[in-house]
């Protein structure tokens, strides 16, 4: 009661202020003193485990489990089980070199060309710096490459691309730069088109065999599926309307919504060139079914046969069809042999597709410095005409040597007229005419013959024994080495 009275005095404002404030402080002090005396003495720090402190502090969270990434990233992070990527990775571990590693794996799985590097080397050495000089006085202007530029590509580059594409396609079609979006290679081009033309879970019809990279380019982020349209060697793997109809009906029965048709012309991996009639049939079919058409024409300038190349842009511009459903992919990786420049094109007659692609290019635009170089390169008409003539001739010559070498071994190839590869029939070397037999041969080629060739299984070919062999990065002296390795492997099967 004596303790409470002074406190009450404080509350009521009537005296006892000092005593009422002092008593609680004293009580708190004596309580601390009592607890301190009864506290056990501290342990010697040297008795503590050495591994305690930071290590133990962080290890306490281990029971929670490993931090997770998104469900989108998990399948992308996993190693691919496609023979196409398996072969490419194996070559990296033991690459062939005619001087330093003559027993290494020879790369026939990558469609790139070194045939005209001498011409590119000369042009770059003479024009590279000048192509970056943007001022009238010839001085370097940093603002021309350092400032923000349109994500869809500089207008000068789109104009140069339009002229270049028309030139390599025989001048039979003109391209409008306003329908064009510059991309960082063909991969972003196909992905952006898939994003624009199909919803997640929709599908594209795609004739087989097809380029294995399409699975990666389309499925990784867009969620769009690919439905194979099976073609056969009896038609030189050329797509037909009946095959498209059958694939579409089967897709609808499974509940899949088909949004378009995707194909390569010239075909990759076969190398055949689609005729004007076939292109009309495809577009007519798409119009009847109200779906889109995506024509990958990245090998348009790598045609070396007698057949005429016809762009789908020419068919769309004939006036017979609804051209807004036509979209074209192009790039410089193959025809100009500069995949490292990462330069591609989306060409579309659909205004919404072009506008959407322009905005999406903020994620994969081409560096301005590269664009400046390409403007000069593509605008050099004299160089381009000489280069393309040499490019086609050198592909033709290399193709003849490679196919003739296989022919002498009794190994035929499909008829082709474009691309940096040939479609080789190795079914005579199979231990069993099946997918399993083909994969066994793929492994033997890789480990015994030390040759990486892409098996048809990776391209969704339904006929076992076909392999894609890319030959435009080979030196002439490499071809006899390849043929000898295949010969020895074939003889080991017979013994």
UniProtKB/Swiss-Prot annotation:
Keywords: Aminotransferase, Pyridoxal phosphate, Transferase. Pfam families: Aminotran_1_2 (PF00155). GO terms for biological process: biosynthetic process. Induction: By indole-3-acetic acid (IAA) and cycloheximide (CHX). Its EC number is 2.6.1.-. Expressed in roots. Expressed at low level in leaves, stems, flowers and siliques. The keyword Oxidoreductase does not apply. Its cofactor is pyridoxal 5'-phosphate. PROSITE patterns: AA_TRANSFER_CLASS_1. Gene3D superfamilies: Aspartate Aminotransferase, domain 1 (3.90.1150.10), Type I PLP-dependent aspartate aminotransferase-like (Major domain) (3.40.640.10). InterPro entries: Aminotransferase_I/II_large, Ethylene_sulfur-biosynth, NHTrfase_class1_PyrdxlP-BS, PyrdxlP-dep_Trfase, PyrdxlP-dep_Trfase_major, PyrdxlP-dep_Trfase_small. The modification N6-(pyridoxal phosphate)lysine is found at residue 334. It comes from the Eukaryota. Homodimer. Belongs to the class-I pyridoxal-phosphate-dependent aminotransferase family. Probable aminotransferase. Does not have 1-aminocyclopropane-1-carboxylate synthase (ACS) activity, suggesting that it is not involved in ethylene biosynthesis. This is Probable aminotransferase ACS12. It comes from Arabidopsis thaliana (Mouse-ear cress).
């Amino acid at each position: 009661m004596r303790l409470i009275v002074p406190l009450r005095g404080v509350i009521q404002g009537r005296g006892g202020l000092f005593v009422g404030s002092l008593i609680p402080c004293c009580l708190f002090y004596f309580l601390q003193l009592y607890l301190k005396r009864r506290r056990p003495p501290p342990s010697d720090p040297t008795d503590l485990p050495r591994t305690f402190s930071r290590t133990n502090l962080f290890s306490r969270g281990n029971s929670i489990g490993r931090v997770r990434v998104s469900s989108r990233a998990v399948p992308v992070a996993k190693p691919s089980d496609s023979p196409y990527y398996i072969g490419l990775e194996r070559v990296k571990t033991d690459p062939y070199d005619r001087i330093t590693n003559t027993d290494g794996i020879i790369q026939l799985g990558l469609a790139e060309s070194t045939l005209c590097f001498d011409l590119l080397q000369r042009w770059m050495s003479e024009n590279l710096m000048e192509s970056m000089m943007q001022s009238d006085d010839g001085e370097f202007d940093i603002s021309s490459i350092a400032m923000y530029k349109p994500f869809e590509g500089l207008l000068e580059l789109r104009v140069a691309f339009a002229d270049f594409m028309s030139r390599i396609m025989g001048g039979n079609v003109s391209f409008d730069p306003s329908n064009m979006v510059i991309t960082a290679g063909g991969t972003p081009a196909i992905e952006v088109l898939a994003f624009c033309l199909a919803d997640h879970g929709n599908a594209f019809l795609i004739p087989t065999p097809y380029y294995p990279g399409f699975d990666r380019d389309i499925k990784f982020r867009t969620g769009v599926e690919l439905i194979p349209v099976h073609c056969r060697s009896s038609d030189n793997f050329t797509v037909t309307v009946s095959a498209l109809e059958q694939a579409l009906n089967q897709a609808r029965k499974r509940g899949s919504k088909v949004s378009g048709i995707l194909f390569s012309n010239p075909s990759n991996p076969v190398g055949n060139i689609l005729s004007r009639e076939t292109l009309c049939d495809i577009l007519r079919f798409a119009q009847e079914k109200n779906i889109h058409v995506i024509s990958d024409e990245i090998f348009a300038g790598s045609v070396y046969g007698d057949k005429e190349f016809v762009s789908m842009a020419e068919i769309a511009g004939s006036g017979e069809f609804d051209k807004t459903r036509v979209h074209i992919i192009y790039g410089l990786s193959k025809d100009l042999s500069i995949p490292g420049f990462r330069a591609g094109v989306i060409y579309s007659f659909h205004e919404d597709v072009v506008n959407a692609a322009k905005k999406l290019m903020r994620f994969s635009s081409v560096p301005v410095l590269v664009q400046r170089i390409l403007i000069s390169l593509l605008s050099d008409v004299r160089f381009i005409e000489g280069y393309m003539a040499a490019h086609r001739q050198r592909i033709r010559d290399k193709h003849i040597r490679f196919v003739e070498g296989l022919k002498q071994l009794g190994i035929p190839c499909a008829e082709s007229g474009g691309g940096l590869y040939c479609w080789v029939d190795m079914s005579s070397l199979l231990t069993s005419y099946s997918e399993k037999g083909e994969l066994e041969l793929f492994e033997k080629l890789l480990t015994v013959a030390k040759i990486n060739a892409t098996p048809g299984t990776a391209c969704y070919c339904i006929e076992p024994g076909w392999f894609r062999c890319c030959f435009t990065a080979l030196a002439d002296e490499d071809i006899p080495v390849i043929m000898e390795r295949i010969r020895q492997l074939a003889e080991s099967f017979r013994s």
